[in-house]
Amino acid sequence: MRRIVTAFILSLLLIACGEAPLKEYSLEVVAEYPHDVESYTQGLFFQDGQLYESTGLRGKSTFRKVDLQTGKALERLDFDKKYFVEGSVMWKDNLYILTWDTKTAFIYDANTLEYKSTWKYPREGWGITTDGKHLIASDGSANIYFLDENFAQQRKILV
């Protein structure tokens, strides 16, 4: 009898914990823009009216300032074949670019795209962005890392 009562209570709890209906969203395509089919996009951001893209392929990684209307690169950085470029972001007048498996980060001048420095990055570089106070990076794990401009970890969160 005790098992029956326990099973009954559990079934009532399961019914009470039913899933909420899924919210549905719709979308509308308002514009389409050309894109270089040779670029394998890893990072993409739009800043101050300009589109920027980091592309990663073994031996063909680039960072590009892109003309939105034509899809053509207005400016371009080509990386050594050993680097597989991933995420990129501009913050505090710097352009930060992460590489995937070589665990390297590059810093360029955000205005001129002139090289500034290379940093050894402690993990795989995947995505990177900023909240205006920190660089925020992912490495493919369940962690998001908040970093200062020298890539020193300030905190991390589990997602």
Region locations from a protein language model:
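C-terminal motif of bacterial Sec signal peptides marking the signal peptidase cleavage site
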Residues: 13-16
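A short helix->beta-strand "capping" segment at the edge of beta-propeller domains
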Residues: 20-38, 68-74
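Beta-propeller fold detector
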Residues: 31-34, 74-80, 117-120, 154-159
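Short coil/turn segments that connect the beta-strands within blades of beta-propeller domains
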Residues: 48-49, 92-94, 132-133
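WD40 beta-propeller blade core
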Residues: 61-64, 104-106, 145
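Short loop/turn segments that connect beta-strands within beta-propeller blades
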Residues: 66-71, 109-113, 148-152
